[in-house]
């Protein structure tokens, strides 16, 4: 029977059934939202809260997994540290054992450098102080051989005496040769000195003759120079007098003493002057400055008058504004007072009507509502 019904169902009926099911589902969702007092009163976003709770759980799970991972890593690191510590102890023990074996095998007491100080057989092994002059044990600090205590002392002494005799004979021969050479040198020096004396006398005569000639020529030259100097001084004095006269004339006729104002003009422009030549402002400039000062005074007086008028205008406006504000506040106060009186009268009349209505309801409605009465409400979302 059901298969026959499905066979004859039209698409329009299927759409109606789907729309009906959709409206029923929407109604149930609406009832769930409307009848939930918490969401309706507080206005909380349940979906957002659920998302936050879900995110918080995910975060807690992630933190828990991270802590567990850290704990596992710490346990693994502790195991590794224990293994490394045991290995270090074992290596230290092996190293100590190897050092002991090496000392016993290769560092025996008889191989030490200071063993000869504590050797019990030192006297038996001891050698004489020296066996020859070139003995390697015969050092400077050993003090076993001093100067002149070698084994071939007599042969060496005889050889030294022969050597001294030869040196003495050689010195005598050298002294005789040096004496003969000194005599020859003295004779040559005496002869050379006599020749130098003759040459010096001749040169002295020539120098005396030349000095006389030079003195005569110098005297003539000095005389001519003195005459030229006197003439030059006369010319210089004359030129100096002429220059002084020309300078005085130029100063008297120049711009400095005549106080020409044009001399202070600068080549950089008409607004610039030369400070060391400026003699002060001209009468036209002073008049121009006084005129500008008068104009500035008049302008300042005009600005002061405008400021005074502006201040008076602002004071007048401020007083008018304060007066208007005071009047507006008084008007508002009167309106509020009238409104409060009207509101009090309206509240009083409403209270009387409510009291009468309550009294009427108490007289008319005598039965009390039961639970069935309240269950018929809030059955739908509309």
Swiss-Prot record:
Identify the stretch annotated as signal peptide in this record: none
Q: Which UniProt keywords apply?
A: Cell projection, Cilium, Coiled coil, Cytoplasm, Cytoskeleton, Flagellum
Residue spans making up a coiled coil are 222-255
What domain of life is recorded for the organism?
Answer: Eukaryota
* Tissues where the protein occurs: Expressed in airway epithelial cells.
Q: What is one process in the GO biological process aspect for this record?
A: flagellated sperm motility
Record carries keyword Thylakoid = no
Q: What is its main location?
A: cytoplasm
Q: Which GO terms describe its cellular component?
A: axonemal A tubule inner sheath; axonemal microtubule; nucleus; sperm flagellum
Q: Where in the cell is it found?
A: Cytoplasm, Cytoskeleton, Cilium axoneme; Cytoplasm, Cytoskeleton, Flagellum axoneme
Its quaternary organisation is:
Microtubule inner protein component of sperm flagellar doublet microtubules.
**Similarity field:** Belongs to the RIB43A family.
The job of this chain, per UniProt, is described as:
Microtubule inner protein (MIP) part of the dynein-decorated doublet microtubules (DMTs) in cilia axoneme, which is required for motile cilia beating.
Q: What is this protein called?
A: RIB43A-like with coiled-coils protein 2
Provenance organism: Homo sapiens (Human)
């Amino acid at each position: 029977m059901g298969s026959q019904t499905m066979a004859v169902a039209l698409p329009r009926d299927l759409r109606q059934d789907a729309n009906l099911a959709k409206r029923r589902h929407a109604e149930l969702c609406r009832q769930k939202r409307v009848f939930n007092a918490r969401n309706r009163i507080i206005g909380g976003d349940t979906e957002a809260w659920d998302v936050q709770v879900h995110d918080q759980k995910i975060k807690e799970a992630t933190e828990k997994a991270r802590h567990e991972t850290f704990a596992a890593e710490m346990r693994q690191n502790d195991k590794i540290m224990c293994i490394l510590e045991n290995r270090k102890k074992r290596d230290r023990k092996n190293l100590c054992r190897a050092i002991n074996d090496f000392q016993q095998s290769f560092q025996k007491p008889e191989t030490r450098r200071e063993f000869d100080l504590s050797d019990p057989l030192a006297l038996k092994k001891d050698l004489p102080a020296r066996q020859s002059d070139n003995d390697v044990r015969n050092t400077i600090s050993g003090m076993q051989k001093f100067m002149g205590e070698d084994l071939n002392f007599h042969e060496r002494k005889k050889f030294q005496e022969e050597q001294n005799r030869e040196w003495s004979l050689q010195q005598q021969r050298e002294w005789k040769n040096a004496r003969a050479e000194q005599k020859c040198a003295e004779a040559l020096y005496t002869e050379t000195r006599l020749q130098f004396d003759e040459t010096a006398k001749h040169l002295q005569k020539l120098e005396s003759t030349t000095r006389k000639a030079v003195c005569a020529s110098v005297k003539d030259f000095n005389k001519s120079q003195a005459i030229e100097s006197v003439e030059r001084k006369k010319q210089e004095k004359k030129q100096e007098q002429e220059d002084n006269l020309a300078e005085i004339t130029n100063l008297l006729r120049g711009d400095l003493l005549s106080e020409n104002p044009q001399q202070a003009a600068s080549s950089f422009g008409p607004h610039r002057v030369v400070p060391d030549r400026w003699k002060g402002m001209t009468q036209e400039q002073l008049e121009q400055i006084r005129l500008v000062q008068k104009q500035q005074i008049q302008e300042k007086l005009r600005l002061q008058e405008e400021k005074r008028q502006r201040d008076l205008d602002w004071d007048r406006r401020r007083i008018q504004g304060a007066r208007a504000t005071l009047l507006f506040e008084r008007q508002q106060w009167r309106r509020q007072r009238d409104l409060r009186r009207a509101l009090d009268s309206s509240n009083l009349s409403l209270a009387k009507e409510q009291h009468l209505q309550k009294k009427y309801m108490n007289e008319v409605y005598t039965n009390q509502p039961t639970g069935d009465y309240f269950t018929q409400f809030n059955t739908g979302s509309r």
